[in-house]
Amino acid sequence: MRVRKRKGAQEYLENNPHYVILEPEAAKGRWCEVFGNDHPIHIEVGSGKGAFITGMALKNPEINYIGIDIQLSVLSYALDKVLASQAPNIRLLRVDGSSLTNYFDAGEIDMMYLNFSDPWPKSRHEKRRLTYKSFLDTYKQILPENGEIHFKTDNRGLFEYSLASFSQYGMTLKQVWLDLHASDYPDNVMTEYEARFAKKGQVIYRLEATF
């Protein structure tokens, strides 16, 4: 879903350099210095308006979180939530998910979240899907051995594609949920999309996979 362009979004991000890392290339290999501790670092690629990343940071203060989104206005709405939360363990990046190795060293990230990514349903756009093999190559470089990806979507086609993509890549599927909200999974933190879909009774799919 497209988000309306937000006036002043660029200046808003630039005026909050504590939370929005404006030169992430300079932080490569030294994210522990950015956060001021050596806690594990989890990233969400495609963080949207920030409900998930903020909720996770408040729930798990012993983990550092980085929300990543390429859309300027979207990231500005995420900043709203981060500022309101005052959580010290969140940072935001406006970068593309295909270029993560420019900003993170090998094994520097402990876990990744992909939530409600664009399904890019047309076959000619397969390479744009965040679970396509070239993206998995990138993720593998910044995660440790046996690093985890947690993935959620309402799109069955993308879910089935991702199951196959992870398996073909040689990843291990730890757990799979075919109807997350009907399960007894206790630790779910919802995104904005997910909360909207849940009200409509839509099925949410989830999986956890390791390299």
UniProtKB/Swiss-Prot annotation:
Keyword Repeat set for record: no
UniProt keyword annotations, A-Z: Methyltransferase, S-adenosyl-L-methionine, Transferase, tRNA processing
Biological or metabolic pathway of the protein: tRNA modification; N(7)-methylguanine-tRNA biosynthesis
Positions contributing to S-adenosyl-L-methionine binding: E44, D69, D96, D118
Active-site annotation: D118
GO MF annotations, alphabetized: tRNA (guanine(46)-N7)-methyltransferase activity
GO CC annotation terms, alphabetical: tRNA methyltransferase complex
InterPro entries from the UniProt entry: SAM-dependent_MTases_sf, tRNA_(Gua-N-7)_MeTrfase_Trmb, tRNA_methyltr_TrmB_bact
Residues reported in the UniProt entry to bind substrate: K122, D154, T191, E192, Y193, E194
Domain of life per record: Bacteria
Catalytic activity: guanosine(46) in tRNA + S-adenosyl-L-methionine = N(7)-methylguanosine(46) in tRNA + S-adenosyl-L-homocysteine
One Pfam family recorded for the sequence: Methyltransf_4
UniProt EC number: 2.1.1.33
Region (Interaction with RNA): 124-129
Function noted in UniProt: Catalyzes the formation of N(7)-methylguanine at position 46 (m7G46) in tRNA.
Family, as annotated: Belongs to the class I-like SAM-binding methyltransferase superfamily. TrmB family.
HAMAP family per UniProt: tRNA_methyltr_TrmB (MF_01057)
Protein name (record): tRNA (guanine-N(7)-)-methyltransferase
Protein species of origin: Streptococcus equi subsp. zooepidemicus (strain MGCS10565)
Lineage, top ranks: Bacteria, Bacillati, Bacillota, Bacilli, Lactobacillales
